[in-house]
Amino acid sequence: NLIGDAWVPIGPAPIPNGQVAAGPSTAVSGRVISIAVHPTNPNIVYAGTAQGGLYRTINGGTTWTPIMDNAQSLAIGAIAISPSSPETVYVGTGEPNFSGDSYFGVGVYRIDNASTTATLNGPFNLDAGAANIFSGRAIGKIIVHPTNPAVIFVCSTSGVGGIISASGTTPSRGIYRCDNA
């Protein structure tokens, strides 16, 4: 057997009216940008889409449920599950695959009780000086500290749409750390 000769599509299923440019009755699922698998239950998987939000399956992909429909941005760039507290999931908004139809984000969301009731918190996007550093950008990667789920590292990429810090400068792309997420 060759690696990859038995791939099976598992979703998320096409979204009716998901792409306005293609017409009002076109069913699409969009680009899936990121994926994360629960560290102890492989049937729980999270999938982040370019403009459809975050989806969760609890049955290995048989069915998918959107769990971020009330977020300010449905463009998902990164997903990270806390290794020490897998009910805590961090989601970075903004599509890091910069192209003509990419969407920027508004920061990082934390989802508590992620595999059940999925309580959405955020977006978290302010620096120590209360400047909004992630709106108009994309979050391309999130790493959660292995033993402390409140410590996260975020890679911010692309776009600078209207972001000005308290000092009047545009924040740099790069790696950011938060100790109280």
Kindly give the residue locations of the regions a language model identified.
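Extracellular glycan-interacting surfaces
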Residues: 1-181
